[in-house]
């Protein structure tokens, strides 16, 4: 057995969301194939550090509650964590519990897979006014993020959503649904259901999607009014 075969690399991964977990799995697979050729050996220990009490990041706390099937991806991630060469440490926050110097002193490499943890600044006049929110904070609320808001103001009769991507569609869809519909078809957190029922009432406001023309908007409004 060569010296490289006896060497065990130590890798630290910051963030145990999909990117961190899959990167760990891919690294171990590639190391078995190419490690000896590259002089790295074929063995490694990967330590995953997650600041939340649970892993899987946006799969758990970023997918809209009315898409529970997408959250089944977590089962595949759990299988990856069954690998004895991957070790998960939750409730460990980079910059608070461990520093880069700490990690570099103990590991051969450090991978950051922290994702987008903050909203992108809007950089528009009035963006700092009351009633203007970033989607990330709203998503944290309706997904029950551990440190997210427990209450959210839902009394507005008219809401403008800036953007037309997947998150914008999720936000618009959540705003227009009533509490009974959410309870029946989603895994919405209990405090959010109560907030919808108490503040929004039974008739949520209509939403006009950005990916359609005036005719489609008119037909959507007519359909809601029963015309």
Segment roles from a protein language model:
Residues 119-198:
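Glycine-rich dinucleotide-binding loop and its adjacent helix/turn
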Residues 108-115, 160-162:
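Short hydrophobic core segments
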